[in-house]
Amino acid sequence: MNKFLIIDGLNLVRRIYAAIPDENDMESLKERVTSACTKLLRVHHPSHIAIVWDGDEISWRKQLYPDYKKGRKPMPEPLAQGLRALQEHLATLNIASIYAAAEADDVIATLAVKTAKAQGEAIIVSTDKGFSQLNHPRITQWDHFNQQYLDIAALEQKLGVDRSQFLDLMALAGDSGNKIPGIAGIGPKSAAELLKTFRTLSTLFSSLPNLGAKQAKKLAEGKEMARLSYKLAQLQTDLPLNINLKDFRANSTPHPAPNIEQ
């Protein structure tokens, strides 16, 4: 059975970079990223490995909602200048890069789902909990920094909803980290309570007459924003990826791996 280790490139590298005392020390970054990737290979023993990078194009999400991810700090200039050399170094370790046109998340999600549907196992290396919506028994998420798999049961308990409701929760309450708006006046706790009662967005919006006038008014006025928020939060899992699985085989003997543009 294929086991595909899919690394969220900037999620890994920016966290490692943030821990380096000298922001211009690209050699230390290269050493630490190499060490992290070596450890990932040793821990998981994948048959295939890829590291997926964000691209420079404006994402379809930002085109749809210009405030999406607004206010995020830009990549530090030394890291931006040294990133290509790091990617080329990883290729010599047989870790192929995939360059997304815009956001890496949709490419990662598509790779994971395609692997799972082909009866393989996909392990996403990222701390981004947005991947938790990929509800498939052969897709898991690994937090390299805490050396543990994402605990879905603990996340369900923290959020107060089932995994199948994660997207509905973000549609109602939004996601401050990504500047996904949700419905004004509906916070995470009230959204979770509504979903406990009504289970789905469609049932909730068809049941507004059963709610108090004030809350029903908020929901009715925010219905279109909830739909937009759901779309922004939902990962695309069916992108046309022109790749060949053999290009991502993990070998013990390092050799240059292809860098694949999407």
From Swiss-Prot:
Output the InterPro entries linked to this UniProt entry.
5-3_exonucl_a-hlix_arch_N, 5-3_exonuclease, 5-3_exonuclease_C_sf, DNA_polI_H3TH, FEN, HhH2, PIN-like_dom_sf, Xni
Q: According to the lineage, what is the superkingdom? A: Bacteria
Query: So which cofactors does this thing need?
Result: Mg(2+); K(+)
Q: From the UniProt record, which GO molecular function terms apply? A: 5'-3' exonuclease activity; 5'-flap endonuclease activity; DNA binding; magnesium ion binding; potassium ion binding
Query: What are the GO BP annotations of this UniProt entry?
Result: DNA replication, Okazaki fragment processing
- Protein keywords: DNA-binding, Endonuclease, Hydrolase, Magnesium, Metal-binding, Nuclease, Potassium
Under Enzyme Commission nomenclature, its number is 3.1.-.-
Principal EC category: hydrolase
| Cofactor, how bound (note) | Binds 2 Mg(2+) per subunit. Only one magnesium ion has a direct interaction with the protein, the other interactions are indirect.
The 5'-3' exonuclease domain extends over 164-251
Q: Which residues bind K(+)?
A: 172-173, 181, 183, 186
Q: Which HAMAP family match?
A: Xni (MF_01192)
Q: What is this protein called?
A: Flap endonuclease Xni
Q: Which organism is it from?
A: Shewanella putrefaciens (strain CN-32 / ATCC BAA-453)
